């Protein structure tokens, strides 16, 4: 650094970077600490002082293993210099004060150097490790300077609260002196420093970047922070392990939200077999996506918009696969409504004994030999005769008059048995005709969608819910609403 005889040479001194050619001599206590860290000389640059301080803290393992930004030095010579038992890297003011007291600048022949160094020390710490060390160490120079630099340092301290955009006494802006310091990046340092602090605060250092820079904030670094931090300036792809815990928290929150949403759809017994639930949930999520794609009514490529039918009540267009309007639940007009119902037929063949019974009764009336009727074939109770109701109704009136004339009670009982069996068959037909009407009712759970979700358990199934509700029941391992059995599979049924 050149000597300064007048104030006109101040800009040149301000542009001198800290740590470049500035030789400092530590006092005896600090020098002893630096030699323990591996220093062999007695004159250092600012970078070398910071390097050996970091090596000393690493060698003695003074940092806290859990909270790595805290350094404990109460039983160490470093603590005697700092006059504190412990300090945090986030608040390195004790280190600044120690460096002011224990560093002496060499080759300090005039007041210009003291002025430039004093201006550097009065500024607040900047956003890289170089500025931490240089700003803190140079602040000690006004304390050890000669009396000739007193006036200039006072003028520099008076200009401290001024805005950076204001001009200094020589006509140049103050930012001209600060700009070289802001350009000092991690690439100018060697591969050494405080890796324990860097690794512990790597996440916060990168998340606080708004301009994409990988430089580390000063208020998060120790004064021993030096060259080793440059090794990660271009290794942003290796930071995957830092976001692993956050991704696990997000997945847990998503799973909890899905469980809360499913619990609103009447799904009891959700806590059964929790060990299998975690494995089945992943499979069910994939199956749900596949089901929604292959079982959706809109995935049929052969059905076009021209085939859609319009509801006569609410004027909504529906797909031709649905016979009910999805909005008002009205039946589609002319949906097989006028077609006659088929008569339920019975596969039992006609029995000639019943059809020929009236003729035989007339023949037996003409005969006066036997007064007791003995029918040839009387069926037992275990093998009943089931005939259509209309045939029984025709046979009974024609034979009622003749059978009442002198016939035994067995034949009369037989006719009444046939009549009762015909009535029971009529009730059976009515029940079978009523069962399809139950399918017209909406879902038992949501009361909105049609019953198209077939819940299968074993060799039986129940069609009492819609397909979305049935999938929710299967997903959350709820029993069948109809019988309480375990749901094995859910399929979508198209009723036409």
Curated annotation (Swiss-Prot):
Region entry Disordered, spans: 1-21, 115-177, 210-229, 259-302, 350-428
Q: Where is the composition biased (Basic and acidic residues)?
A: 275-286
Composition-biased stretches, type Polar residues, lie in 1-11, 131-141, 210-223
Q: Which GO terms describe its cellular component?
A: nucleus
Q: Where are the zinc fingers (RING-type)?
A: 443-484
> Ranges of Low complexity compositional bias?
146-158, 397-410
* Residue stretches making up the SWIB/MDM2 domain: 22-105
Q: Which domain of life is it from?
A: Eukaryota
Q: From the Swiss-Prot or TrEMBL record, state where the protein is found.
A: Nucleus
> Zinc finger (RanBP2-type) residue ranges?
305-334
Q: Where is it mainly found?
A: nucleus
| Motif Nuclear localization signal, residue numbers | 448-451
For biological process, the GO terms are: negative regulation of apoptotic process; protein ubiquitination; regulation of cell cycle
One GO MF term attached to the UniProt entry:
ubiquitin-protein transferase activity
Recorded hits in CDD domains, A to Z, give: MDM4, mRING-HC-C2H2C4_MDM4
Q: Where is the composition biased (Acidic residues)?
A: 287-301, 361-373
Its quaternary organisation is:
Binds to p73. Interacts directly with p53.
Q: Which family does it belong to?
A: Belongs to the MDM2/MDM4 family.
* Function according to Swiss-Prot or TrEMBL: Inhibits p53- and p73-mediated cell cycle arrest and apoptosis by binding its transcriptional activation domain.
Record's PANTHER family? MITOCHONDRIAL UBIQUITIN LIGASE ACTIVATOR OF NFKB 1 (PTHR12183), PROTEIN MDM4 (PTHR12183:SF37)
Q: What is this protein called?
A: Protein Mdm4
Q: Name the species this protein comes from.
A: Danio rerio (Zebrafish)
**What gene name does this entry carry?**
mdm4
